[in-house]
Structure formats: C-alpha cells, structure tokens
A protein has these predicted regions:
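Glycine-rich segments within core transmembrane alpha-helices of 12-TM secondary carriers
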Residues: 2-40, 44-55, 107, 111, ...
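Symmetry-related core transmembrane helices of the 12-TM Major Facilitator Superfamily/SLC fold
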Residues: 11-17, 41-62, 107-108, 171-180, ...
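Short, flexible helix-coil linker/hinge segments at the edges of structured domains or between repeats
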Residues: 31-92
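A helix-boundary/kink motif common to multi-pass secondary transporters
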Residues: 35, 40, 158-165, 240, ...
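Membrane-interfacial loop- and helix-cap regions that link adjacent transmembrane helices
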Residues: 54, 62, 75-249
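Helix-loop junctions on the cytosolic side of multi-pass membrane transporters
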Residues: 60-75, 187-191, 293-305
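Intrinsically disordered, low-complexity terminal tails of fungal membrane proteins
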Residues: 68-84, 300-326
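C-terminal transmembrane module of eukaryotic multi-pass membrane proteins
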Residues: 215-254, 258-265, 271-282, 287-293
Length: 326
C-alpha cells in the first residue's frame, strides 16, 4: 500500500544492512589483535562464506507471491513472463510514458560511488586492521539505523501528504549529506596516496584521534543508508505498477553499477584522495538537485490514478490490476 512503502523499503534495507552488521562482527573478532595494516586472515573469509551460504538457504523459504495478501485483502499483482525483446521495448515505452525519470539517472549513477573512497581511501588509509574492522561494524550499523529512520520519516503522516514528505525528507538527506562531507574535508586534505597518515595508522585505543575519525566513518554509513531508502521510495512514488517499478529499479541498479565501475577504475588509476573525495561529494550533492526537480514535477500525494502497465502490455489487452492502482 502507498502509505506503507517507506516502512517496507526500510524493512528490506534494514534487514540487508543488519546482515552486514552481523558480517562485520566476524572480521572484528578474528582480527582484534592485529594492529598493523595487514589483510584479513583466511578464517574471516571462511566464516563470511558460511554466512552467505546460510543466507542462500533461508532465501529458499520465501513465500510464493501467489500466497501474499495485503492488509486490505487484495492480492499482489504477478506480472506475466515476457521475452527479452519485449523487455527492451518496455524500457523505451517506460521512458516515453515518464520522461521525467531521466532526472533519476544521475542519482542512480551516484548511488554506489561511495564504495572505493570510504572503504579504500578513508577506512583503509587511516586505520590499522582491527580498527578498520571495528569501524566497519559501526559503519554498517549507521547504514542500518538511518535506513530505518528514513523509512519512518517518509511514511510519517504528521509531516503531511506524500508530496510534502518527499520535500521534507529530501531536505533532511541533503542537509545530512553536506554536513557530513564538510566534516570529511579535514581528513581528506591530509591524506595522500603512498604516504602514511600523519601520526601513523590510527588504532582504536588512540583516544585523541580514533573517536572523531570513526564517528565520521559512521556518519558516512548513515548517509548511504538514508540514500538507498530514499532512492527506492522516490521510484515507488512515481507508480504503483510493478511492471513499471521493475524497470525503474533496473535503471537504479544499472546506472549504479556503471558509476561503481567508473569510480573503481579511477581509484585503481591512482586519482588523488582529494579528487576522489571531491567527485564523491559533487556527484551526490549535484544529483540531489535533479531529484528535487523530479519531486516537484512528478511526485503527488497518490499514484493510484497513474497508469503504466497499459503502455507496457499489448494495446489490445485489458489493463493490469496494478495499472488500476491495486
């Protein structure tokens, strides 16, 4: 249901990020005694592999979509299988039907840009091994917590209608993002490739430095958690049609993967840490401006009357239940 989209999106990302929290506990425990810049031991990777296998087994227990019933008694729409050619046509038709979705592409492109800077250029540069693991644990917790908080805000009726909530939460995310990156300017200025951090690697017992750097790393996680939840909620606010939403989600994933491939290439090529940081901040803040226009133009208090599946099905077929707003 429209009123619960934020809740279920945050539930999805909350569970996902909670899994990373559990996963981060393993390297933290396994490498607790390592105060050098080494790499994780074999036991860490074995434990993580076992955890992933367990997750795969649990996924087999997911209920069949035909058995899922909403709170209002209606059943979820199950789209029929289509051919690869039809899927390509659907993408073109979806953009023709909703050309404003193009404004979502920059936001999608920036969605995974954070990975090399945060993991390699900040966490990997400033901390010793056990502090990296310890910081990653709290980074993942920040992702988890902020994903849940953002989902709750997006559904909070006290703020107003859905359109108003979109603008308010956009403001929250934009403010959080820039506040965190202003704090990130200071460590970025003193980090250089091939050079040990001033004062040496930071260990979590170094009370004069560890607290501030770990806190900043946690807030980077908070930005990412809020970013991902807001992305899926905005996409969900544009339509209720699962056929259309599946295409929007593919846009987010494809452009995000494209951005990740590019930024990892930049990192491998040795772009300065300042350049990596600047591109990270600039892309995120700049793409938020495009999303603001998208909200202004296309996010309404309801999408029930908006259709999409009609354009993506054969013209002579009846509209799907999803297209009717179910």
């Amino acid at each position: 249901m429209e009123k619960d989209k934020g809740k279920y999106i945050s539930l999805f990302y909350g569970l996902s990020f909670f899994g990373t929290v559990i996963g981060a506990i393993i390297p933290t425990v396994e490498n607790w005694g390592v105060t050098t810049a080494g790499s994780a031991n074999d036991a860490t990777y074995i434990a993580l592999f076992i955890l992933m296998v367990m997750g795969s087994v649990v996924a087999c227990c997911i209920s069949d979509p035909s058995r899922v019933i909403r709170n209002d008694g209606s059943r979820v729409f199950i789209p029929r299988n289509t051919t690869f050619v039809q899927e390509l046509k659907n993408i073109v038709l979806a953009i023709k039907r909703e050309p404003w979705i193009i404004l979502f592409f920059p936001y999608s492109f920036a969605g995974l840009w954070y990975i090399p800077y945060q993991s390699n250029d900040f966490n990997g540069y400033f901390f010793d091994l056990r502090t990296r693991a310890f910081g990653s644990l709290w980074f993942d917790f920040g992702q988890f917590a902020m994903a849940v908080v953002m989902g709750m805000l997006l559904d909070l009726k006290a703020i107003g209608g859905r359109r108003r909530r979109a603008f308010v939460c956009w403001g929250v995310l934009f403010t959080l993002l820039n506040a965190v990156f202003i704090g990130g300017v200071f460590p970025a200025r003193i980090s250089h490739r091939g050079v040990t951090p001033p004062g040496g690697l930071i260990d979590l017992t170094d009370s004069s430095r560890a607290g501030g750097y770990i806190a900043l790393f946690v807030f980077y996680g908070c930005v990412d958690g809020a970013w991902q939840t807001f992305a899926w909620w905005i996409a969900g606010a544009l339509s209720n049609d699962p056929l259309v939403l599946s295409i929007y989600s593919s846009f987010y994933k494809v452009f995000g993967a494209m951005g990740a491939a590019i930024v990892f290439s930049l990192d491998v090529r040795g772009v300065s840490y300042q350049g990596m940081f600047g591109s990270y901040w600039g892309l995120l803040a700049g793409s938020m401006l495009f999303v603001f226009v998208l909200i202004y133009k296309r996010v309404h208090d309801t999408s029930v009357l908006l259709t999409g599946a009609v354009a993506l099905e054969k013209a002579d077929e009846e509209p799907s239940n999803a297209a009717k707003g179910v």
